Structure formats: structure tokens, C-alpha cells
Amino acid sequence: MSFFALPILFFLGFLILLLAFFIVKQQSAAVIERFGRFQSIRQSGLQLKIPLIDRVAGRLSLKIQQLDVIVETKTLDDVFVRLKISVQYKVVKEKVYEAFYKLDYPHEQITSYVFDVVRAEVPKMKLDDVFVKKDDIAIAVKTELNEAMMDYGYDIIKTLVTDIDPCLLYTSPSPRDL
């Protein structure tokens, strides 16, 4: 073996050893795949993987996150109203696999459910009732979201109706309303 081969082998061995270690931050999880197939979920701390065989496929935050959704809909008394719904959610630590592999875009999924529930609830109410029953709207959104998102590894912590803004333009009454 030549004099130059030994340092090169030492350097390559050191590099492969470095590739074996990785760090997972506090309140997050790392998904490990081996040749593209799920291998394990690693929690916070210094972790070890087989270099060149295992890879970190992704990381998920276990912190509470907030998504603000603005929904525009019409009330029972034909007033357009814009509601800002704040959804606080997090990935359940025991369901990281589901959160990573079953759902690609959680923000869009949550937004769709918020739109669906708000557009089902608000048209049954008059404008004044929307202000009075904003907690009922928030509870309805949370209940619906929690049922749907728990299967995907997400827990809905709280939903809040943070802003209700009636639009200045009123729709003209239909002939049957006169």
C-alpha cells in the first residue's frame, strides 16, 4: 500500500463515520428510511444510522402550530361576512408515521375542513347571531377537525374565531323576500 493511500482511506472512513451520526432537535421527530422503505422514527438527541444505506426522509415538528384561515360566506339575512378562524394543532408523538406518510399537505386539508364547517354553520345564522355564537362555530370546527385529522396523526388543540368582518356590500333582496 502506498503512502498516499493510507490518509485517503483514513479520510474516507472518517467521512463515513460522520455520516452515521445526526441530531434531532427537541420537540421534533425524524423519519428514517432504508433504501426508500420506512425503517424507524427517531426522537430528539444524537442519533445513529447506517451511512449510505439509511437516510433521514424527513422531519416533523411536534410543537403546537397555528393556521389562520379566512372564510367568506353569507348569513341567513343575506349579509356577506368574512371570518378569520385560527386553528392550533400539533403532530401526536405516537402518530408521527401517520402524519408523515398518510397526509401530504396538512395545511390544505385543515383549511378544507374549516371552509366546510363554517360554510355549513354560518348560513343558518343571522349576522347578530354570528357574533353571539362565535364560540359555537369554533367548537363545531374543532369537533369536525379533530375527528378527521386524528386519523392522520394530528391533534387539534384549539380553534378560535378571531375576527368577524361583515362586508359593507349587502345583496339585494330577492322578489320572494319582499
Task: Describe each model-derived feature in a short phrase.
Residues S2-F21:
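Single-pass alpha-helical transmembrane signal-anchor segments
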Residues F14, K49-V56:
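Alpha-helical membrane-targeting segments
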Residues L17-I32:
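Aromatic-capped interface at the extracytoplasmic side
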Residues I32-F35, I53-L168:
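Amphipathic, interface-forming alpha-helical segments with heptad-repeat character
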Residues E33-L48:
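Membrane-cytosol interface motif
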Residues Y170-L178:
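Single conserved hydrophobic/aromatic residue that forms the stacking wall/gate
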